[in-house]
């Protein structure tokens, strides 16, 4: 991701604040009182940039996440100005229990507004964290409380959805695990959050200019008052500041290369690894030296997964895959990303056996071509909730494309950019079938539906042959066509967008709109809401 990387620089920054007071009253869920006349306490905004800390694990149902700026070392003394939750990249690894009532206080110590979106978690609409759609962005010095029940076990993640193309880019994300009541026990349960950063110092100026331009050009982009006057500026900054070839530092849990800690195991242990892609690029992951099973995708279990070996799991932006294996091959073994891009070799860690005293013979092979894991044919072919030939209340086609508007590149759904894209208008209880078609010649489009899971029914006109696949994020590659289905069982206004957030910012967004639904907040033009 675009990160402001600086070599051997200790950064300190004084944020100039005006009209300071001690007002720190919390927001209620309607989040309506957000005018510019509200003043901030000096203690509510960080005035000195500290270094990041080690990512902590939170295992309770009520806690606080503080959005704050930190200086973060990626590798080899390369420092970035990161935006963090609780001072680390990634933010805390949150683990809650199925059925728990969760209460999270978001405290904003940044100079810009923020929110938290619970990616994949089926929360009430007013807890989804989408500025201008479900809430007003949380202003500097303010606090907002998210409350919901952890209903569906699985591997999820959280991230800012305010100007996400930049704020997620800076590090505002973390993992969110709902542990099931009937979940299998594992001796080791690791979470690996994948990301990519940038070392070209020229990107710093580019990012600063982009942030400033988007702050001016994208203001007021909420569902009640969006217009397209700033479309040209948005597209221009997209193309200027988000050259994917410039990402050359790939990370696992915020570190790259030798700075990534090993994963320790003992012989005979059952090990679970949760892989979360918080970046904007797909990553092909290879586990060396062990047979393994892919037990879930986007947190949803796969029926009777079979054992595989030396297959590459391609994880698209926003997706999650969980694997399990038995530690039955003592030694030191790589878990690494495959590919040819600069930075790929930095995304690797070691599976390291305790008490192993032999010679470690494994070597990285990130350039090798290996078979690709095929989710469409994996697991036991049982009947899911939906079938291709059943009756549906609504059928919809989303033709995804990369197009030109003058000299600018835009990303369209049915040849339109948000907010001109057609919404999916549903009634509660509707069964909805959606055809996703990628007409782009080069770009993947990992499509993410908020507030719902969908079942993948077919790929390129052929029914899936493996386990029923239930997801919230599906990567549609150039030329591919998928049919998915979901039940409209969570009233609200929900985003359905590409999770390459560069594409979303440049137009590839639509909404699922429930008939008769009215949000319980009032969009505030002064909140500077930027839903992508």
Question: What kind of region is each of these model predictions?
Answer:
Residues 1-9:
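Bacterial N-terminal signal peptides that target proteins for export
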Residues 16-19:
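C-terminal motif of bacterial Sec signal peptides marking the signal peptidase cleavage site
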Residues 21-64, 168, 173-210, 308-431, ...:
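Extended terminal and domain-junction accessory segments
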Residues 29, 63-179, 282-316, 333-345, ...:
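Histidine- and aromatic-enriched segments that form or immediately flank copper-ligand environments
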Residues 94-98, 263-268, 325-326, 424-429:
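Extracellular and analogous surface-interaction loops
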Residues 127-130, 134-140, 149, 194, ...:
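Histidine- and aromatic-rich segments of cupredoxin/plastocyanin-like copper-binding domains
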Residues 191-267, 276, 401-403, 409-416:
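Acidic-aromatic/histidine active-site loop/patch
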């Amino acid at each position: 991701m675009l990160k402001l990387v600086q070599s051997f620089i200790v950064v300190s920054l004084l944020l100039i604040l005006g009209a300071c007071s001690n007002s720190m009253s919390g927001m209620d869920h309607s989040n309506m009182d957000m005018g510019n006349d509200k003043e901030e306490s000096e203690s509510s905004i960080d005035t000195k940039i500290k270094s990041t800390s080690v990512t902590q694990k939170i295992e309770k149902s009520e806690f606080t996440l503080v959005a704050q700026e930190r200086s973060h070392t990626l590798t080899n003394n390369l420092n970035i100005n990161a935006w963090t939750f609780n001072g680390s990249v990634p933010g805390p690894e949150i683990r809650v229990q199925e059925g728990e009532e969760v209460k999270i206080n978001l405290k904003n110590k940044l100079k810009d507004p923020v929110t938290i979106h619970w990616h994949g978690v089926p929360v009430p609409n007013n807890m989804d964290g989408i500025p201008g759609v479900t809430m007003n962005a949380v202003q500097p010095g303010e606090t907002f409380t998210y409350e919901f029940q952890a209903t569906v076990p699985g591997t999820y993640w959280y991230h800012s959805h305010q100007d996400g193309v930049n704020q997620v880019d800076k590090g505002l994300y973390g993992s969110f695990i709902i542990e099931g009541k009937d979940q299998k026990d594992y001796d080791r349960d690791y979470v690996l959050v994948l990301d990519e950063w940038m070392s070209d110092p020229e990107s710093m100026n580019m990012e600063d200019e982009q942030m400033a331009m988007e702050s001016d050009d994208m203001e007021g982009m909420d569902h009640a008052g969006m217009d397209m006057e700033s479309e040209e500026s948005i597209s221009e900054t997209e193309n200027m500041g988000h050259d994917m070839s410039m990402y050359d530092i790939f990370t696992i849990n915020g570190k790259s290369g030798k700075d990534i800690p090993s994963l320790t195991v003992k012989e005979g242990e059952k090990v679970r690894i949760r892989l979360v892609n918080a970046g904007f690029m797909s990553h092909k992951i290879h586990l060396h030296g062990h047979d393994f099973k892919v037990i879930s995708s986007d947190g949803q279990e796969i029926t009777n997964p079979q054992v595989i070996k030396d297959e590459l799991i391609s994880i698209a932006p926003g997706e999650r895959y969980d694997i399990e294996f038995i530690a039955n091959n003592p030694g030191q073994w790589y878990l690494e990303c495959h590919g040819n891009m600069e930075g790929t070799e930095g995304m690797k860690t070691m599976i390291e056996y305790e008490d192993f005293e032999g010679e470690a013979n494994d070597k990285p092979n990130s350039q090798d071509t290996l078979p690709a894991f095929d989710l469409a044919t994996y697991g036991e072919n049982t009947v899911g909730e939906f079938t291709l030939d059943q009756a549906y209340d609504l059928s919809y086609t989303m033709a995804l494309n990369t197009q030109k508007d003058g000299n600018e590149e835009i990303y369209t759904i049915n040849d339109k950019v948000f907010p001109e894209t057609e919404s999916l208008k549903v009634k509660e209880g509707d069964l909805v079938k959606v055809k996703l078609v990628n007409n782009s010649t080069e770009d993947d489009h990992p499509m993410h539906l908020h507030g719902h899971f969908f079942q993948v029914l077919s790929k390129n006109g052929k029914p899936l042959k493996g386990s029923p696949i239930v997801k919230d994020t599906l990567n549609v590659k150039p030329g591919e066509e998928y049919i998915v289905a979901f039940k409209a069982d969570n009233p609200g206004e929900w985003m359905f967008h590409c999770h390459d957030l560069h594409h979303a910012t440049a137009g590839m967004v639509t909404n699922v709109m429930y008939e008769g639904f009215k949000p319980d907040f009032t969009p505030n033009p002064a909140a500077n809401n930027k839903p992508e």
